[in-house]
């Protein structure tokens, strides 16, 4: 059985088993605390019956006007808990918060262009590639900016793909 609850400060000292994955971006403690203070409803922790962390979601709300949206900063599931639908459940919670609490037009995320497993998973969740961001990750790896329109974007304008790649300095990141 899995419990998904709001992420709390103490979770920062419990989720190393999840962050050991080389594809998981990790951040400094103040970064996580900033998210907890500004967007607490967009951070979730999944744990098993014994309280062991299984996965987490960290997100935020950002942008202006029709670019107001929810952003997936990190979603990660421990290797032993993958392929049971946990990432889908965590993503759904963030999407729901982005829609109902923050009234966003879409949800976006960045994923390494080489991470085909994640790209396929996000596509299955209804996300599509909006643009390529050249050299976004360390080692000059490109990112795909993937988006999913929320009900507020009735005409789905937020997910019309750009025809050309952008650089991090050119993009509203």
Curated annotation (Swiss-Prot):
It is an enzyme of class 2 (transferase). Its EC number is 2.3.1.-. The keyword Plastid does not apply. It comes from the Eukaryota. GO terms for biological process: N-terminal peptidyl-methionine acetylation; regulation of actin cytoskeleton organization. Signal peptide: none annotated. Pfam families: Acetyltransf_1 (PF00583). GO terms for cellular component: cytoplasm; NatB complex. Keywords: Acyltransferase, Transferase. GO terms for molecular function: protein-N-terminal amino-acid acetyltransferase activity. Residues 2-151 form the N-acetyltransferase domain. InterPro entries: Acyl_CoA_acyltransferase (IPR016181), GNAT_dom (IPR000182), NatB_acetyltransferase_subunit (IPR051646). Belongs to the acetyltransferase family. ARD1 subfamily. Seems to be involved in N-acetylation. This is N-alpha-acetyltransferase 20. It comes from Dictyostelium discoideum (Social amoeba). The lineage of its organism: Eukaryota, Amoebozoa, Evosea, Eumycetozoa, Dictyostelia.
């Amino acid at each position: 059985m899995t419990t998904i609850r709001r992420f709390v400060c103490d979770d920062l000292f419990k989720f190393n088993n999840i962050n050991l994955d080389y594809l998981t971006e990790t951040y400094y403690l103040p970064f996580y605390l900033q998210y907890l203070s500004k967007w607490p409803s967009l951070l979730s922790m999944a744990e098993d019956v014994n309280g062991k962390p299984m996965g987490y979601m960290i997100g935020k709300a950002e942008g202006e006007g029709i670019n107001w949206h929810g952003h997936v900063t990190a979603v990660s599931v421990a290797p032993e808990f993958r392929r049971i639908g946990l990432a889908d459940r965590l993503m759904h919670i963030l999407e729901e918060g982005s829609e109902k609490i923050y009234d966003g037009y879409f949800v976006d995320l960045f994923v390494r262009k080489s991470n085909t497993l994640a790209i396929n998973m996000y596509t299955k969740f209804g996300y599509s590639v909006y643009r390529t961001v050249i050299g976004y990750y360390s080692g000059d790896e490109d990112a795909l900016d993937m988006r999913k329109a929320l009900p507020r974007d009735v005409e789905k304008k937020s997910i019309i793909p750009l025809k050309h790649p952008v650089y991090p300095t050119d993009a509203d990141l």
